[in-house]
């Protein structure tokens, strides 16, 4: 399970500042869903290789009606979704009645809660936080989010130990044990070829999308066609069900974010679009099916969700549902809109289906397997270096400060998604346009479909950096004569 951390507190206590500080470690694309979650933002963050989802909530006023006000509904829902809460207060403003109301509500929820006193820059932290002990939430962690002061300590001494208790490292790195063998390449870490085979693992497939686009119908259609579901295996992600299934001799784990197998237990809150549930399913999947309603077209919510999928590095299959019943003219308009708004992800297969009637559903799994195989295929260093060399020959890197950027060699840096590491000189100065050129060149050369490909650049080390030049005996004698001449001239 990917842990969820919610930032709550009064308005203007620095929640958004801390949110930006936390998610910046992964340069995360914030999944902001307009309208549906007006005052909540979602982003991915990382601490020592352990990922978590961070929620930035709107301020809770704590008016005369208490904390349970309609203005705070979204923030209260974020508290329910979260595994841990960072309750933020303003050290400069001191203890306020709204802080007491929020603390009372948090105590009633019995959620792991840590009290964070922000804006302690320029203050004596010990004196600034004294009043907040009256909230009865235990130790107080002073920070200055705008400057980053105390944030690392907060992560290391609060979130990291809590995450260790929530999910031991061996559980978090469950898949890493498999992928570690994949990454050992020409560096003395040779492994037996048959020790690891990605084809032997079930493909984790998540079906995600906005409400009422047909996720449940598609899930039922897939399961109804196969009828080989052995049992429902409840997942660690809340309100999601992990359903083992088999198709064409290949094992899958269908991550159902619609709760289709427990429909009788679904509450009104679950029927709404649960952002957290969807984000956790994406994080846990190998391949994601993004379902879009053909009648409504691409919405901002679809693009936000798509951005999170790409930022997570997951393989992608786009499914345009409710294709039946549309006139040919409307179909052409929908395709033109898709080409225009989704032109930046030309690597993903697009399928036009009717989940209700089953047309086109059978072709989805061919693209799912293709995407998974592309993301897990092993490529040697010699092949990657050869592709890089051909790319440079076709289009040389630009000049930077009068010198040509030099690319030396490339090797694999990871899989799922495929990562290519390029070593060279001045590679940090490469413009984004050339980086995109290299990424597209590698994708076409490797025939990668359905999976994003990432390129990382590493600067070659200067062997003479931080080393003083050692003069030869002849140079030493010349230097002495020169120094004598300078002294006589004075």
Swiss-Prot record:
GO BP of this protein: ribosome biogenesis
Domain EngA-type G span(s) in chain numbering: 3-166, 203-376
Domain KH-like: 377-461
Gene3D superfamilies: 3.30.300.20, P-loop containing nucleotide triphosphate hydrolases
Amino-acid positions noted as binding GTP 2 in the UniProt annotation, renumbered to this chain: 209-216, 256-260, 321-324
Record keyword Zinc-finger present: no
Binding-site residues for GTP 1, renumbered to this chain: 9-16, 56-60, 118-121
Gene Ontology MF term list: GTP binding; ribosome binding
Record-linked Pfam families: KH_dom-like, MMR_HSR1
UniProt keywords, alphabetically: GTP-binding, Nucleotide-binding, Repeat, Ribosome biogenesis
Domain of life, source organism: Bacteria
InterPro entries cross-referenced by the UniProt entry: G_ENGA (IPR031166), GTP-bd (IPR006073), GTPase_Der (IPR016484), KH_dom-like (IPR032859), KH_dom-like_a/b (IPR015946), P-loop_NTPase (IPR027417), Small_GTP-bd (IPR005225)
The protein's role, per its UniProt record: GTPase that plays an essential role in the late steps of ribosome biogenesis.
Annotated family: Belongs to the TRAFAC class TrmE-Era-EngA-EngB-Septin-like GTPase superfamily. EngA (Der) GTPase family.
Subunit text: Associates with the 50S ribosomal subunit.
PANTHER family cross-referenced by the UniProt entry: GTPASE DER
Protein name: GTPase Der
Gene symbol of the encoding locus: der
